[in-house]
Amino acid sequence: MKKLILVASALGTALAMGTMGSALAQKSAADGIAEYRAMLADGNPAELYEAKGEDLWKKKRGPKNASLEQCDLGQGPGVVKGAFVTLPRYFADTKRVQDLESRLVTCMETLQGLNAADIAKTRFGQGEMANVTALATWVASESRGLKFNLSQAHAEEQVMYEVGKRLFFMRGGSHDFSCASCHGEDGKRIRLQDLPNLTKNPGDGIGFAAWPAYRVSNGQMWSMQLRLNDCYRQQRFPYPLFGSDATIALGSYMGVNAKGAENIAPAIKR
């Protein structure tokens, strides 16, 4: 009997130690990634894109030889600070809900005379599309530290949220994935990477509150639309068109859910 008690006690201790070890391993992995990102953020290359974006905002360009300083991002012509954390939102002049990137292209067309359709067809990282990413990076940086608070006052904003929600949970592609497959509940991860639950506020600087971001793995600046396109690629879906209602609706869904989260964009990612 005494031997049985000793064996049971030893097994209990081993199980407890195993559970503690697993918890410590998970915690240390998450902490290690956080420390890695903190070190990388000291001298984030995104600062170069911020500088380029600010210069593009103030520089006279295009057939109309005009700057973007009168661009209305939702807070009034020329007002940049605070705009990013309210987008996507409805704009009366275009009669549609727009995210930051599609709104910037609207301003580039109306104020500078550039061709919006041509920009939309340009590959990410090239030509005027690279300029859109730089502009978005700078605009996002001007709202760093502010809390997300997307409007749902207009009927079109409400529609886009609901469309985004449906798209988020829609399964498809050869792998039968949805956005929710990775980001629909707490506690999911890929390898050492924790996956945020984007059906609610995932926390300051997480998910929607971190993009645009500099990707260390490929040395590129990624906008939110490019990030969503990459998600579609992983789902084995065709890429959405730039400024499509699909990506803007998903942005609306995640942005509204992120209400109260602090913006840290432009962030730095693996």
What are these model-derived regions, one by one?
Residues T19-A25:
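Sec/Tat signal peptide C-region and signal peptidase I cleavage site
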Residues A8-G18:
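Bacterial N-terminal signal peptides
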Residues A25-L48, K58-A134, R144-G145, M170-R270:
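Electron-transfer interface patches adjacent to heme c in soluble/periplasmic c-type cytochromes
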Residues L135-E142, S151-Q152:
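Hydrophobic, well-structured mid-protein blocks that either form specific transmembrane helices
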Residues A38-E54, G145-K165:
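Short, charged low-complexity linear segments at domain edges
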